[in-house]
């Protein structure tokens, strides 16, 4: 016999049980299937029990309702339903008189007299819908009055009875049978026959002639139409009152007059005065274009311009004031039609006016400022040994090295055939190399603000004759902290070329040479307050051109939003997209940190595609090599930070994936603007988490604006997408939770 357990044994046993419970238990496939089957059986059993309980509850409720109904009928009508069935609805039992007995007449076939009705309501006959129905539940059939009545009533009809109603009584209290008219009225009402006394109903025919229900011989409107109707028809040239056509009236002319009566009176007067026609603006020569045609033209291309004295936009290249040499270069490059920003910005630039251009990303802004700039330089004396040391004629500033080099490539396509030299000054390259490139001078310099400020500050480069300044992506330069550098560079230029408020851009001198005032052009995708402050300081009476709605994504991008939580799920979803979406490379994946880019590029390689990274940790040579490999098709996927999100033009990008949502909606717009360029369509997929609540509201608005995009239901229902969440609100919420 075992002795009592000691405390040590009990503690050891408890410890062993805890360890066994803490260890994971690995189940085989058969055990997992068995557990799943048992769980499913229990769920089915519980569902059946719930349904049985609901059915029993419903049956009890129906039974109680039936009992309550019977009790209510008994209290209301004063009868008691026997076990064999219910009494008649009108209060008559099975053994008494039925519905027809209450009418006071007998069977039509045997001619017997009516019997005296019995029951609690024998003194008055019921009328209304209940008197037309019988629910005797198995009583006597409808065959007249019941036989064997205690007494017979007189069958003589009452004279003068004209309306159906209950049987009248004599002075002695005997019931008087209804008259024949009353019987006919009851029979017609019971059978649902129409009566002649019904109110006429108004209906309309197809020929717009009003037709009533009365007889045609009662129509007095057609009796004599030879007098007043003829006068009315003659007084109304647009048409006759009752249809038809007057002699000598042309139907086509009548319709023309009627449509003209519905036209806009202001437009009709303008058409008569100016002899406008209805031809589309594309079918008219340039000299026949009216102000209305130009207004329609601007609406077609979503062009809005203000500033006074705005020239007409370009319809095509050959109708512009661009020199023939530049037009030949445009044709050689392959620009068939101007983009909307080019249509309006180039005519303004050809007037040498200061310009503010606000347009979407990928809208062709580079050519919009390069073409007027080359025309401006063409009026200045060529560079030689006497003036090349004074610096360039034109300066183009961009926020990033990649964008500056891209602008340099595009500018060279126009400038080299004209004999102009372009030099880029960007960070990441040695100053000596760039100084050597400037030894022979250059008409055009493309630079980033940081490196250009250093070279100007060290007197390596001077701006003594710079007269044409372009700031591309000005909002991005301000965001990157280059506002102070921009002010320093612009202030270092000579004030002698600053345009007075009442001057024109170019003034011819006595010698016949052009002495140009400085022209400043600013292009941006958005207009934050810092950019507006910069424009007010350095631009003189600028013309402002807005294409579409500033700061919106392009209409050719399909935006998709997916809620994906955790890096592992993002990894699996990224690999699935790259393998199954079926879009050709190049593809760009945007991240927020450099280390994330190095991690994501490995996932791209796991998906079977070649990838490369682009961020600030790469040298200038590595960045250029990465972009060139992507353009040449050697690399399929580029993983980049927001460094490449502005202005980088990689042709034919079909897909943009936001591995992480940007912290502002402006950056998101510029990211997805890498695809859907040059009239092509693209797809942008964004991985969203609950931590992105600060931008969910703006993101929902952007997706709703896009006609190509479909709203994610989870995003539409999210609380942060319905109400804007600020950083201060999140901070207060975190303090309350702590």
From Swiss-Prot:
The gene is PRP28. This is Pre-mRNA-splicing ATP-dependent RNA helicase PRP28. One of its GO terms (biological process) is mRNA processing. Belongs to the DEAD box helicase family. DDX23/PRP28 subfamily. Residues 10-76, 86-111, 251-284, 715-738 have a biased composition (Basic and acidic residues). Pfam families: DDX23, DEAD, Helicase_C. SUPFAM superfamilies: P-loop containing nucleoside triphosphate hydrolases. It is found in: Cytoplasm; Nucleus. A motif (Q motif) lies at residues 315-343. Its EC number is 3.6.4.13.
């Amino acid at each position: 016999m075992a002795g009592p357990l000691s405390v040590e044994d009990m503690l050891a046993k408890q410890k062993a049980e805890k360890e066994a419970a803490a260890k994971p238990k690995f189940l085989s496939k058969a055990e997992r299937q068995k557990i799943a089957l048992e769980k499913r059986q229990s769920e089915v059993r519980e569902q059946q029990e719930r349904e049985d309980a609901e059915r029993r509850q419903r049956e009890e409720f129906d039974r109680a309702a039936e009992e309550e109904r019977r009790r209510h009928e008994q209290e209301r009508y004063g009868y008691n339903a026997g076990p064999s069935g219910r009494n008649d609805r009108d209060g008559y039992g099975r053994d008494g008189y039925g519905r027809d007995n209450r009418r006071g007449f007998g069977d039509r076939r045997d001619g017997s007299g009516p019997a005296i009705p019995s029951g609690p309501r024998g003194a008055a006959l019921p009328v209304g819908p209940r008197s037309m129905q019988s629910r005797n539940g198995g009583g006597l059939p409808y065959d007249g009055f019941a036989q064997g009545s205690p007494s017979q009533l007189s069958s003589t009809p009452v004279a003068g009875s004209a309306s159906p109603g209950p049987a009248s009584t004599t002075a002695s209290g005997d019931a008087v049978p209804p008259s024949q008219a009353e019987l006919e009225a009851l029979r017609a009402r019971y059978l649902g026959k129409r009566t002649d006394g019904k109110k006429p109903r108004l209906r309309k025919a197809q020929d717009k002639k009003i037709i009533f229900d009365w007889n045609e011989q009662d129509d007095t409107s057609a009796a004599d139409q030879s007098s007043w109707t003829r006068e009315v028809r003659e007084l109304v040239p647009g048409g006759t009152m009752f249809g038809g056509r007057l002699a000598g009236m042309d139907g086509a002319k009548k319709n023309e007059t009627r449509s003209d009566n519905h036209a806009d009176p202001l437009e009709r007067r303008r058409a008569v005065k100016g002899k406008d026609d209805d031809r589309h603006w594309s079918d008219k020569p340039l000299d026949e274009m009216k102000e209305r045609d130009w207004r329609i033209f601007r609406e077609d291309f979503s062009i809005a311009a203000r500033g006074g004295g705005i020239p007409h936009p370009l319809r095509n290249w050959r109708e512009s004031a661009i020199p023939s040499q530049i037009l030949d270069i445009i044709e050689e490059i392959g620009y068939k039609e101007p983009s909307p920003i080019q249509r309006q910005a180039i005519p303004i630039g050809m007037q040498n006016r200061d310009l503010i251009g606000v347009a979407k990303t990928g809208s062709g802004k580079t050519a919009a400022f390069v073409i007027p700039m080359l025309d401006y330089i063409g009026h200045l004396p060529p560079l030689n040994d006497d003036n090349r040391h004074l610096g360039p004629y034109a300066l183009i500033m961009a926020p990033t090295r990649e964008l500056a080099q891209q602008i340099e490539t595009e500018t060279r396509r126009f400038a080299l055939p004209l004999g102009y030299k372009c030099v880029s000054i960007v960070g990441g390259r040695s100053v000596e190399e760039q100084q050597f490139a400037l030894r022979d001078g250059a008409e055009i310099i493309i630079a980033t603000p940081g490196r250009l400020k250093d070279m100007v500050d060290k007197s390596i480069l001077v701006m003594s004759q710079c007269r044409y300044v372009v700031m591309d992506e000005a909002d991005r330069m301000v965001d990157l902290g280059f506002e102070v550098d921009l002010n320093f560079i612009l202030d270092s230029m000579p004030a002698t070329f600053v345009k007075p408020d009442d001057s024109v851009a170019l003034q011819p001198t006595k010698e016949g040479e052009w002495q140009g005032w400085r022209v400043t052009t600013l292009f941006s995708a958005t207009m934050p307050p810092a950019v507006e402050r910069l424009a007010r300081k350095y631009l003189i009476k600028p013309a402002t051109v807005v294409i579409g709605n500033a700061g919106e994504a392009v209409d050719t991008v399909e935006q998709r939003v997916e809620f994906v939580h955790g890096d592992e799920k993002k990894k699996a979803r990224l690999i699935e997209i790259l393998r199954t979406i079926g879009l050709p490379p190049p593809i760009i994946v945007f991240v927020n940190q450099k280390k994330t880019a190095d991690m994501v590029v490995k996932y791209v390689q796991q998906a079977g595609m070649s990838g490369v990274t682009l961020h600030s940790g790469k040298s200038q040579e590595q960045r250029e090599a990465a972009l060139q490999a992507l353009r040449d098709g050697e690399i399929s996927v580029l993983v980049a930070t927001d460094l490449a999100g502005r202005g980088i033009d990689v042709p034919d990008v079909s897909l943009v994936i936001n591995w992480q949502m940007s912290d502002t909606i402006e950056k998101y717009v510029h990211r997805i603007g890498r695809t859907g360029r040059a009239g092509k369509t693209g797809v942008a997929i964004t991985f969203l988490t609950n931590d992105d609540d600060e931008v969910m509201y703006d993101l929902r608005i952007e997706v709703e604006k896009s006609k190509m995009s479909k709203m994610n239901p989870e995003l539409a229902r999210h609380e942060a997408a319905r109400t804007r969440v600020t950083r201060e609100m999140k901070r207060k919420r975190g303090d309350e939770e702590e």
